[in-house]
Amino acid sequence: MTTSSPLIAIVAGEISGDILGAGLIKALKVHYPNARFIGVAGEKMLKEGCETLFDMEKLAVMGLAEVVRHLPRLLKRRKQVIDTMLALKPDIFIGIDAPDFNLGVEEKLKAQGIKTIHYVSPSVWAWRQNRVHKIASATDLVLAFLPFEKAFYDRFNVPCRFIGHTMADAIALQPNRQEACRLLQLDENQHYVAILVGSRGSEVNFLSEPFLKTAQLLKAQYPDVQFLVPLVNEKRREQFEAIKAQVAPELEVITLAGNARAAMMVAEATLLASGTAALEAMLCKSPMVVGYKMKPLTYWLAKRLVKTDYISLPNLLANEPLVPELIQADCSPENLAKHLSLYLSQMPEDVAKKNALKQRFMELHQYIQCDADAQAAQAVVDVLNRE
């Protein structure tokens, strides 16, 4: 590519994608100060100067029922993006996450000779692995946060670049517990356990009871311990409080409006659902127990669809069972409390194990701390410069 002012199209479908898009635009401006950015943008991308075809929130739908209800509108929006891009002929199109929306766009554009990148690999390595063929036909390059994702694509000869994880860039290698205590207005001499019941309504429904009963068992064993419960919004707080009133009305907990990251930095141990929270706990160097429950039919299907040995990102990254994963029937208060109590124990052998675990967390953090924004921008430059 000879132009120093490329037209770069970027589509983000939700808040997390908007954050990634803004970081990418900022890093791309170092290479191309006169580039023009257009696509579907949220607040942060708009601040970086990206033009948007429509409000990003028009793409942000959660859950199958909501997707089905909004399908005609989503298809109309996708056609609008495709038609606009074919008319504008950008030098490159970057779809950030939202694979159900973006891969269809990328496939159409690539067929017309427009270079395409998909930023954030779908969990194709874990389930519905046949999607890799669609990804191959839709993209010139996949940008992956995690090294095992690249290893998966390599098996299928799909171009993929491991860029590190933006969260690993955002969290310091040595978490500042003192600062986190100040932020949350907590006594730094106190012992805390963080309890994360999930961000989805279904997770709060399934996990609040076993997690609260676990807290009761720990309190009986360690009377000085206090429990921090960060909740993503007011709706989830009300949902959690209603379950707590039924299950453990006497148990004292400190509920927090968000601030999960600070809570995990403060805590001696964290009890959480699987997902990105487990990676965040690892980066905060918080020893954790992963517990998960779901509807029996969902679990039956998941058992047959999921192709990985582990469900939590720390274990997947390490390719070994670093942290306990207690799923479905195993996710009992007794089991959860037994594993968590080892992190609270002051017995020399337990303290040594806990310190060794934190050291592994540190090594994994360093492994995926690569300045992902800059790496992603360089990948875009490399694809643009390809003939």
From Swiss-Prot:
The record lists the catalysed reaction(s) as:
a lipid X + a UDP-2-N,3-O-bis[(3R)-3-hydroxyacyl]-alpha-D-glucosamine = a lipid A disaccharide + UDP + H(+)
Q: From the UniProt record, which GO molecular function terms apply? A: lipid-A-disaccharide synthase activity; phospholipid binding
Q: What is the enzyme's main class?
A: transferase
Quick check: keyword Cytoplasm in the entry?
no
Q: Which GO terms describe its biological process?
A: lipid A biosynthetic process
Domain of life (superkingdom)? Bacteria
Keywords in alphabetical order, please.
Answer: Glycosyltransferase, Lipid A biosynthesis, Lipid biosynthesis, Lipid metabolism, Transferase
Q: Does the keyword Transferase apply?
A: yes
* EC number in record: 2.4.1.182
- In which pathway is this protein known to take part? Bacterial outer membrane biogenesis; LPS lipid A biosynthesis
Instruction: Choose one Gene Ontology CC annotation of this protein and give it.
Output: membrane
Write out the function statement from the record: Condensation of UDP-2,3-diacylglucosamine and 2,3-diacylglucosamine-1-phosphate to form lipid A disaccharide, a precursor of lipid A, a phosphorylated glycolipid that anchors the lipopolysaccharide to the outer membrane of the cell.
Q: Which family does it belong to?
A: Belongs to the LpxB family.
Q: Name the chain's protein.
A: Lipid-A-disaccharide synthase
**Source species of the chain:** Glaesserella parasuis serovar 5 (strain SH0165) (Haemophilus parasuis)
